[in-house]
Amino acid sequence: MASKALAIIAGVGPGTGASIARKFAQTYSVVLLSRNPSNYEPLVQEINSTGGQAVGISTDVSDANSVNAAFDQIAKQFPSSALAAAIFNPGGGFVRKPFLDLTEDDYSSALKSQANGGFNIAKRALPLLLQAKDSIPHPPTLIFTGATASFKGSANFASFASAKFALRALAQSLAREFGPQGIHVSHAIIDGVIDIPRTKAWKFEHEDAKLNPDAIADSYWHLHTQPRTTFAFELDLRPYVEKW
């Protein structure tokens, strides 16, 4: 029997990353990357106990050596599995400060976690996606998670917006380079507050004013399953009452 194809989710916590992992684990083996093993260990156990296959690897996406070690481990554990999808979803680099209070470390840390992290994951994932394009039912896919800050540099968000703008530019360049080679590179703008454990207590005037992480995961799966005739580069997701 042929080995099950693989999806890699970089940036897994109890919210959106977990929802993406559960969605893709319905079809693929999944590898979950996060710096803190406590972010993925319960999810790995959950997926494996319900008939899926998941492994977690402690990885700092901003560190090329850490990413290389993770991909080397993936190659050893899944030597004959094609890479169907890679999702870049780290939440690092979020700082809200007046510009004059920002430190150089604040600024560089945001760029490292988002721009450098996206570069490091793409550098290792794209060769595998290119190898897989003739052996899986859907186009090999690389999705980057963006934010409101990907297209709007708001006051007090100079470091995060700079990092997210850079990540979006990387995604667009890769889409133009690798799309003609059959790889679907996409950037998803998550424009609003996501309904995750740390935002549960946040109250809003309107019902359903927070993004549902399971619905975000459904949208990512939709991107992955789009045919080559109909690639979407960018997808905006926001609650119906979100001003934009």
Features from the language model and the residues they span:
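Conserved glycine-rich Rossmann-like NAD(P)H-binding loop of the short-chain dehydrogenase/reductase
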Residues: 27-42
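Conserved NAD(P)H cofactor-binding loop of Rossmann-fold oxidoreductase domains
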Residues: 87-96
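Conserved glycine-rich cofactor-binding loop
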Residues: 11-14
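Catalytic loop of short-chain dehydrogenase/reductase
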Residues: 92, 110, 130-166, 171-172, ...
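Substrate-binding pocket helix/loop in short-chain dehydrogenase/reductase
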Residues: 97-99, 103-111
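The beta1-alpha1 cofactor-binding region of Rossmann-like NAD(H)/NADP(H)-dependent oxidoreductases
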Residues: 38, 58-72, 104
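C-terminal helical subdomain
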Residues: 180-183, 187-195, 200-244
